[in-house]
């Protein structure tokens, strides 16, 4: 693909130049080629976007529920019509295989938008009788202008997960995509405008998180920030949001999730789940089950089943329909993952497979890392304690149910957890003791629109998707009505 034209900001229904004068480049990580130069939003641009959003939000909130629902449904239709085009752009920008982006990224994002478009008429208040002459009623009102700050691993899906409930509740959103993968969020802005969204209701500000993101979190005109990213950045977002104007926050901050295989499990099923929990999207998924706990007596057999499945991974041309494994998103991220792999070797974990970059034709110029499995791991190893966010699985052994529950919970994270077992009683007994916000039994990774997703502990605050997220983008107003004569004590 030839280099794209310089990408601008999207404010008030159209593209506009950044006033900052700064730019950055976005690359294709499969081969290192520059895709585009992108303009970076500065403080003045954030001010412009907020003013635009305030204007648009008033128009948007004044529409009826059915009017807003119809506009969002039109956006869903356009997303699905342009699925292949958007998937190709997402593949170029992220490096993910087209077989994945064309069937997951836009599809699941559109599903969430359709879900919330249907829920708009369900946003309602309540009526509370006090006595014969008085009652209270409540209204759910939009917050106003909110901000979404996205991560680089699911660019358009995250933009939709954040914008769908915000817009459905009558808010306007200013979205800052990751500077690593900024392209599809701009296309989403075009689609919203084409669907009939009033100007300013969805503005996109590409830029560096430490600058553009900080300006958004500090801006007094923004009522809420929804952030997806790392723990350290999340703490800064939360501190800035509170210090500036006590903004509400929703945060999804990653994890180091356990996958527990019990001794009664079908090991073929367990191996299939472990592969999806570690190598889908080349391991760049927040919920990945990177700590795989296996009964000691099953370890050797489980390892052989994993090795057989690693042989079925197909890395290569990301547009080949047979490819199911792409490069990492950037060269700095590749280098960070390689540092973790080196640390795992240094601390005594045994490399079952992988452990290096992929080499040869089609790989040498890209950010490729081989699917890597460590075994003979211990809980104190760096690769077991810290989030790697790459194609690195750690296999650990255990002896008893109580032991594995304790060890699974021994982490600062609490995003996801899963178990594989044939015992229904054990499944629910164990899941109820695991400290994680998203749990799976005999499966892994699906996050449908109806399912609230979010973490315990350092893995986040609040939830995305589900009815509760729609409500979190509203504020409740209580009104008392008195029909009798008011009595004063004065």
UniProtKB/Swiss-Prot annotation:
Site annotation Seems to be a necessary countercharge to the potassium cations: residues: 248
Binding residue positions for K(+) 1: 26-27, 93, 180
Enzyme Commission no: 1.2.1.8
Keywords of this entry: Metal-binding, NAD, NADP, Oxidation, Oxidoreductase, Potassium
InterPro entries hit by this protein: Ald_DH/histidinol_DH (IPR016161), Ald_DH_C (IPR016163), Ald_DH_CS_CYS (IPR016160), Ald_DH_CS_GLU (IPR029510), Ald_DH_N (IPR016162), Aldehyde_DH_dom (IPR015590), BADH (IPR011264)
Entry binding sites for NAD(+): 150-152, 176-179, 230-233, 254, 286, 387
Keyword field contains Cell division: no
One of the record's GO molecular function terms: betaine-aldehyde dehydrogenase (NAD+) activity
Cofactor names: K(+)
GO biological process: glycine betaine biosynthetic process from choline
Cofactor note: Binds 2 potassium ions per subunit.
Binding site for K(+) 2: 246, 457, 460
CDD domains listed in its UniProt record: ALDH_F9_TMBADH
Disulfide-linked positions: none
Reaction(s) the record says it catalyses: betaine aldehyde + NAD(+) + H2O = glycine betaine + NADH + 2 H(+)
Record-listed Cysteine sulfenic acid (-SOH) modification sites: 286
Active-site residues, as the UniProt record annotates them: 162 (charge relay system), 252 (proton acceptor), 286 (nucleophile), 464 (charge relay system)
Pathway(s) of this molecule: Amine and polyamine biosynthesis; betaine biosynthesis via choline pathway; betaine from betaine aldehyde: step 1/1
Keyword flag ATP-binding: no
Family recorded in the similarity comment: Belongs to the aldehyde dehydrogenase family.
HAMAP family according to UniProt: BADH (MF_00804)
PANTHER family reported for this sequence: ALDEHYDE DEHYDROGENASE-RELATED (PTHR11699)
Quaternary structure (record): Dimer of dimers.
Function of the molecule: Involved in the biosynthesis of the osmoprotectant glycine betaine. Catalyzes the irreversible oxidation of betaine aldehyde to the corresponding acid.
Name the record gives this protein: Betaine aldehyde dehydrogenase
């Amino acid at each position: 693909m030839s280099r794209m034209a310089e990408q601008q900001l999207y404010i008030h229904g159209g593209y506009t130049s950044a006033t900052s004068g700064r730019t950055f480049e976005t690359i294709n990580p499969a081969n290192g080629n520059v895709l585009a130069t992108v303009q970076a939003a500065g403080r003045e641009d954030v001010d412009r976007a907020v003013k635009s959003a305030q204007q648009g939000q008033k128009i948007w909130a004044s529409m009826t529920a059915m009017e807003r629902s119809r506009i969002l449904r039109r956006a869903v239709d356009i997303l699905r019509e342009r699925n292949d085009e958007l998937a190709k752009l997402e593949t170029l920008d992220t490096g993910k295989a087209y077989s994945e982006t064309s069937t997951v990224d836009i599809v699941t994002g559109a599903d969430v938008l359709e879900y919330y478009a249907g829920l708009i008429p369900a946003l309602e208040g309540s009526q509370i009788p006090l006595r014969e002459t008085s009652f209270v009623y409540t209204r759910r009102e939009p917050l106003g202008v909110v901000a979404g700050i996205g991560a680089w691993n699911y660019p358009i899906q995250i933009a939709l997960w954040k914008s769908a409930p915000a817009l459905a509740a009558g808010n306007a959103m200013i979205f800052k995509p990751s500077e690593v993968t900024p392209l599809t969020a701009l296309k989403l802005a075009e689609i919203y405008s084409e669907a009939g969204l009033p100007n300013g209701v969805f503005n996109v500000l590409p830029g560096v998180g430490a600058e553009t993101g900080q300006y958004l979190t500090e801006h007094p005109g923004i009522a809420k920030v929804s952030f997806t990213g790392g723990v350290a950045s999340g703490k800064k977002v939360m501190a800035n949001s509170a210090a500036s104007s006590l903004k509400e926050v929703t945060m999804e901050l990653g994890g180091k999730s356990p996958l527990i295989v019990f001794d009664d499990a079908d090991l073929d099923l367990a191996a299939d789940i472990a592969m999806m929990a570690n190598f889908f999207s080349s391991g760049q998924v927040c919920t990945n089950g990177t700590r795989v706990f296996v009964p000691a007596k099953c370890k050797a057999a489980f390892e052989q089943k994993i090795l057989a499945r690693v042989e079925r991974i197909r890395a290569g041309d990301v547009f080949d329909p047979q490819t199911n494994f792409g490069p990492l998103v950037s060269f700095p991220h590749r280098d960070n993952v390689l540092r973790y792999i080196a640390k795992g070797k240094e601390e005594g974990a045994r490399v079952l497979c992988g452990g290096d970059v992929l080499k040869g034709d089609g790989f040498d110029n890209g950010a490729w890392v081989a699917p890597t499995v460590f075994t003979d791991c211990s809980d104190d190893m760096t690769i077991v304690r810290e989030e790697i966010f790459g194609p690195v699985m750690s296999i650990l052994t255990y002896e008893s149910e109580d032991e594995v529950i304790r060890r699974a919970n021994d982490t600062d994270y609490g995003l996801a957890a899963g178990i594989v077992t044939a015992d229904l009683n054990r499944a629910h007994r164990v899941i109820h003791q695991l400290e994680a916000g998203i749990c799976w039994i005999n499966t892994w990774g699906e996050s449908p629109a109806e399912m609230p997703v979010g973490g315990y502990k350092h893995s986040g605050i609040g939830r995305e998707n589900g009815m509760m997220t729609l409500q979190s983008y509203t504020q409740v107003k209580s009104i008392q009505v008195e029909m009798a004569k008011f009595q004063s004590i004065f």
